[in-house]
């Protein structure tokens, strides 16, 4: 009996023990590892994973490996090595590892964000980027769409004058409408029940993608009941049902001679492919309804929660740093005033505001460890070999908090992005990649940067944003999910007297 148990354990150890493809090659230093569970028993059990990985660099260096369950994962925590992975060898490392939770969220690896590299991912990324190009000029200009929604946001916030509120949902609505206009040329009215549906499934997907689920680390555990997977499936189904309803309704009014949004772009590509008018890389099987709705779902998921979260982080840091907030008010008053609303061209004048946004993206990156990459081929990072199929994590937190690259990296110091005179934006370090880089970089970076600047500029022009009367400041600890979230908090909204007076003068 005991002999059989021992034999079984030895067999399992052999099957799941990491095997090197190139026995003579030099591999990154590794944490201790055990069969089946890998390095999990030796990883810190408390604190944020990105910070724990950063601390491990002191012992193992800027690149090291861990066994996450049965999978080898290389952790990269230096900008030079990170750029090698993302840019110099971007094709080598453009894959996505297969995980149970990501497979569910991406409808079995469709879409853009979680899809593995290949013809499907390249096609949908190219089509999505082509859509953003539609919004450069004219009536559909991105800035016009953003400002239209921010104006509605500000009008709504003004109804809470003198009150302390959680601005999460109002900002969510504004950002959702920007994405909806880009995807469908439609927006939601306040009170539309679909807004609550979108917010609920977004939160549900983000929450259950980020449970550090053992089934992602040890795939064979999928055979057992799993509450996290069931919850995730439920939220993904709600998302899919809503997007499918939108898609079916849109098919009736689609016009191939009027391409004005992302759904138009995807449907036109499908029509061309079905009619044999597309190139060899545009297979109609890659443009099924399921593929299309997953890509639209990715744009919503990536574009809404991320921007909403960064706006909240920015407000939180300003509440903690009233001296910076005071300078921002002075900058806006001097360079924009109250006779007009801020525009994108004001980025050249509102330098402290732009520096503040950059500092928030450094201190609290949207995704502290990005989305995991996968080696598509046997390759290398620096002097170390990396086998095909290896998962690679870029620890953006480490890049943005390296004391050798950043003076007092844990301190909120927007002025670090300005020259000493405060008259020019600078790049104080090359260890800064808030939107990633290379083939897997964020396709919505331009949109996100415009939204963040305009939302904050409009809010600061119109409102005094203050700590609530109870003195409760936001927590800056954060909640590391797929997106680095901030705990709910309230801010006291007061319409600025100077803005009120300017509006009164303009109406007479």
From Swiss-Prot:
CDD domains in the cross-refs: CYP17A1
EC number: 1.14.14.19, 1.14.14.32
GO biological process entries: glucocorticoid biosynthetic process; hormone biosynthetic process; progesterone metabolic process; steroid metabolic process
PROSITE patterns per UniProt: CYTOCHROME_P450
Record keywords, A-Z: Endoplasmic reticulum, Heme, Iron, Lipid metabolism, Lyase, Membrane, Metal-binding, Microsome, Monooxygenase, Oxidoreductase, Steroidogenesis
GO molecular function, one term: steroid 17-alpha-monooxygenase activity
Protein residues bound to heme: 442
One GO cellular component, as annotated: endoplasmic reticulum membrane
Compartments where found: Endoplasmic reticulum membrane; Microsome membrane
Summary of activators and inhibitors of this protein: Regulated predominantly by intracellular cAMP levels. The 17,20-lyase activity is stimulated by cytochrome b5, which acts as an allosteric effector increasing the Vmax of the lyase activity.
Alphabetized Gene3D superfamilies for the sequence: Cytochrome P450
Chain sites annotated for binding substrate: 202
Record pathway: Steroid hormone biosynthesis; Steroid biosynthesis; glucocorticoid biosynthesis
UniProt KW Cytoplasm keyword: no
SUPFAM superfamilies on file: Cytochrome P450
Role according to the record: A cytochrome P450 monooxygenase involved in corticoid and androgen biosynthesis. Catalyzes 17-alpha hydroxylation of C21 steroids, which is common for both pathways. A second oxidative step, required only for androgen synthesis, involves an acyl-carbon cleavage. The 17-alpha hydroxy intermediates, as part of adrenal glucocorticoids biosynthesis pathway, are precursors of cortisol.
Assigned protein family: Belongs to the cytochrome P450 family.
Official protein name in the record: Steroid 17-alpha-hydroxylase/17,20 lyase
Species annotation: Pan troglodytes
Gene it is expressed from: CYP17A1
